[in-house]
């Protein structure tokens, strides 16, 4: 099925969870925030949050600096 990730389409298998998507992209950790269809999904829900065709996923990585 097709989902949008940071504005680009990506093919993922049916039943893909948010955790599986992040793992496949080598993204994760405490400095990452994710929203699906404009709603923030808490990290504790990533393993159970299944993606659906057409979902729009935005992944933001926070980087410290100064």
What feature does the model see in each segment?
Residues 1-65:
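Ubiquitin-like/PB1-type beta-grasp interaction modules and other compact soluble beta-rich domains
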